[in-house]
Swiss-Prot record:
Entry note: cofactor: Binds 2 Zn(2+) ions per subunit.
Domain Protein kinase: 481-748
Protein name as catalogued: Raf homolog serine/threonine-protein kinase
Segments for region (Disordered): 1-79, 258-315, 338-358, 383-472
Record annotation: effect of changing residue 645 to N: In oz178 and oz201; 55% larval lethal, 100% abnormal vulval development
PANTHER family assigned: RAF HOMOLOG SERINE_THREONINE-PROTEIN KINASE RAF, SERINE/THREONINE-PROTEIN KINASE TNNI3K-RELATED
Phenotype upon changing residue 108 to W: In n1925; no effect
Amino acid composition bias (Basic and acidic residues), ranges on this chain: 338-348, 453-462
Annotated effect of mutating residue 453 to A: Probably abolishes phosphorylation. Multivulva formation
Amino acid sequence: MSRINFKKSSASTTPTSPHCPSPRLISLPRCASSSIDRKDQASPMASPSTPLYPKHSDSLHSLSGHHSAGGAGTSDKEPPKFKYKMIMVHLPFDQHSRVEVRPGETARDAISKLLKKRNITPQLCHVNASSDPKQESIELSLTMEEIASRLPGNELWVHSEYLNTVSSIKHAIVRRTFIPPKSCDVCNNPIWMMGFRCEFCQFKFHQRCSSFAPLYCDLLQSVPKNEDLVKELFGIASQVEGPDRSVAEIVLANLAPTSGQSPAATPDSSHPDLTSIKRTGGVKRHPMAVSPQNETSQLSPSGPYPRDRSSSAPNINAINDEATVQHNQRILDALEAQRLEEESRDKTGSLLSTQARHRPHFQSGHILSGARMNRLHPLVDCTPLGSNSPSSTCSSPPGGLIGQPTLGQSPNVSGSTTSSLVAAHLHTLPLTPPQSAPPQKISPGFFRNRSRSPGERLDAQRPRPPQKPHHEDWEILPNEFIIQYKVGSGSFGTVYRGEFFGTVAIKKLNVVDPTPSQMAAFKNEVAVLKKTRHLNVLLFMGWVREPEIAIITQWCEGSSLYRHIHVQEPRVEFEMGAIIDILKQVSLGMNYLHSKNIIHRDLKTNNIFLMDDMSTVKIGDFGLATVKTKWTVNGGQQQQQPTGSILWMAPEVIRMQDDNPYTPQSDVYSFGICMYEILSSHLPYSNINNRDQILFMVGRGYLRPDRSKIRHDTPKSMLKLYDNCIMFDRNERPVFGEVLERLRDIILPKLTRSQSAPNVLHLDSQYSVMDAVMRSQMLSWSYIPPATAKTPQSAAAAAAANKKAYYNVYGLI
């Protein structure tokens, strides 16, 4: 690659474009109010070729073929023809993109769009024509056409020494056990036991908060542990020009993990906020004095310093600077007034006067009540003068003061006193204690807040919210629903129409004084029922414990299949296509229930509902084996008795010879009886009135429904399916998945065969004129040999043959 020559530019004082706001860097989550977002000042960390911040003419360079002393005459030349229509741009963090060379678009606008899409701050970057960041930068005020015409290749590099040092796009997340619990940096709630943490940036979060974790890894959190990173940051800070250079070096010196004090980290800097805290003569030491009066004053929460943790460590919380205390007190009072004002808006919907409210006097170490702060949503720390822990030392100015306007000051004054980088990170970095203090863990906040004393933990005057009465999951309280009227009763309970956020069906179960084991089994079944969601299954909405055990399900606006077949007048004669569709939907719903290990145990036409549109089928009253099981005591042992509707009961259920006769095949048998009802419009065994006789004969396999009552247009494949569903041996019955496939394979004829006899004309009657004409045509079509056509016997035989052929064609014989 040939060396590129650069030239100075005189048009570099162009103001920042208002259409290119500076985006917030993801890896710096606490810089919402930093000075980086200011458009009227250039960041001291910005390169001379920063995409959004052009500098003076002596710091911008332009690409040119030769270094010329004067720039006169350049406007008279024609715009150069560019060689490349697309330019490859290499971005930080090993990213790359392509930029289209558009006429009139400057390089600053084009490259800034790429950086903003990736949430990279353009002020912290500079652009080179080489992969070496030490090479001279290009002038971004030039158009992309001019740059493309002078580039030896179609590549540009965007470098940022600062981002490469303090940020990374790769977290080192590991699973951690937090004992004691730590606060999540996303939701600020405690992490109980198991959680996740990045080993680089120390970002902690719950598993449920993983989607809100920052994309970039902020390596500044590891500054107190990494000496190499501190050296690199000192090198970057040395490149900062102007009054902000000393501020950056002071902050970095206080964060450095070295035992000695850095020469740059002196409190005698020119910054007014830094000089307000003096190390010499600014700290009062309060030794511990054990006395009743001292103990009373220490345990009182109203005192300025309630309690010291150790008698060997000095109390460094008292700062002998009254002006600074008053200054911070004004800030805290203003913040408290703002908080009370916002609370008044939330409660009344209008702005209430807060001047008459009592503003509490903040003591050292008291945090603004109600303020929650984490690394994603930072707030101003209200600790006025540093850490309140007796084992830590405040080596840096308080957060929220540098780079922010104080009361009575203009924003311009505060904006010129700090660098954008320092203001963005100052209140997010932990402090490092000196050698005299015991070691402590790094806190994610700027200050390590002192834990409260026992007398401070509870506030007797604070109103506590009333506790909500406890009830189990999906349990509905008696005052939350209304019973309207009775709908009907069945084998296991009575159904009512009711109101529970809409019309519902409330079924009171026939259960009296359930035992603890039965109640536990009932809750387990409810836990399964609440997970059922299917188009052909009634929606389970909850259960009721008192005054009677009941379940609440979806209300079906329609009638049961039993009423459509046997009760309503005139009776509904379903077409064969509608019958197949109903049976398909029942098979779909039952196949879904069996996939959830739910046995219906009482499938019948009374529990199959047709909606008002007559096209949707719903299955109800499923599951609840505990309620549908009846136990009797015989010889000191419990024996299970069959319960349910005997007409739909499978033979093995009637016999009760197995420990658990209820299987998916027993539901298939009940489905076969439902098929018989809808195909014959009759109940099975209607000619037998003795209930015990039906139980005995069906249980032994001597009795089956009368197949002769089934309608004659039933396809043979459906008849075969019906026979398989009501087989005596349950192992020979299909499952509902197979039943569904066989129903889908049934093909109905497009034309329906007529069941009435045709009007056949007798041969000895007089034919009509039309019959005579057609008979003559048939005679003319027949082939008669010439030798035999002359004889009358042959002619009569031919006519008789034609008549037979005529009637065979029209189906009359």
